[in-house]
Amino acid sequence: MEGEKLIEDRGFLAAPLTFVVVVVFQLLSKWLDQLKKKGSKNTRESELRTEIKQLLREASALSQPATFAQAAKLRRSAATKEKELAQYLEQHHKEIKLSYDMYGKGLLASKVVIYLILVLCFWRTPIAIIAKQLVQPFGTLLSWGTGGHMTGHVMVGIIPWLILSNRVSKYVCRFVEF
């Protein structure tokens, strides 16, 4: 019963709280990826698009031979606006990518720090105790890093628990939409 005492000493909520931390990191990562893919619509881009549409609409309305020069001028103006929009979008996408990459690196760094803290706090301490029949072929893998054995039970270590939690949270996050 020394394993149960170890779990009581460290807190019986260690496994669920660790899982929640892993799920939160997965959700934040997915949210950041979706924001990066979606991008952001802003007023400058929408203004340029409406101006281009308006100029092309006016140019197509002028189909008389007498108004050909004016229609050509409107089309050239629309073409310059399209070039301006393309340059603006390129610059805007670079800025967005840079900022999201910075947030992604910050998220990764905080994930690594939190995982290291969890490993240091729970090294050689079981996170959970599971009946040996439930995890028959994987018992030794799950008990890696716990430093002890119990008859009839498998003590789950922090590193296998983090790996398992990470895989399960990735699966769960596939069904979450933002």
Swiss-Prot record:
Short name of one Pfam family: CHD5
Subunit and interaction comment: Forms homodimers. Interacts with GET3A.
Job description of the protein: Required for the post-translational delivery of tail-anchored (TA) proteins to the endoplasmic reticulum. Acts as a membrane receptor for soluble GET3, which recognizes and selectively binds the transmembrane domain of TA proteins in the cytosol. Involved in the control of root hair growth through the regulation of syntaxin SYP123 expression.
Organism this protein belongs to: Arabidopsis thaliana
Subcellular location: Endoplasmic reticulum membrane
Disruption phenotype: Strong reduction of root hair length.
GO BP annotations, alphabetical order: root hair elongation; tail-anchored membrane protein insertion into ER membrane
Protein name per UniProt: Protein GET1
Signal peptide residues on this chain, from the entry's feature table: none
InterPro entries reported for this sequence: Get1 (IPR028945)
Family of this protein: Belongs to the WRB/GET1 family.
Keyword Manganese: no
GO cellular-component term (any): endoplasmic reticulum membrane
Cytoplasmic side: 33-110, 165-178
UniProt topological domain (Lumenal) ranges: 1-11, 132-143
Superkingdom assignment: Eukaryota
Transmembrane portions of the chain: 12-32, 111-131, 144-164
Keywords: Endoplasmic reticulum, Membrane, Receptor, Transmembrane, Transmembrane helix
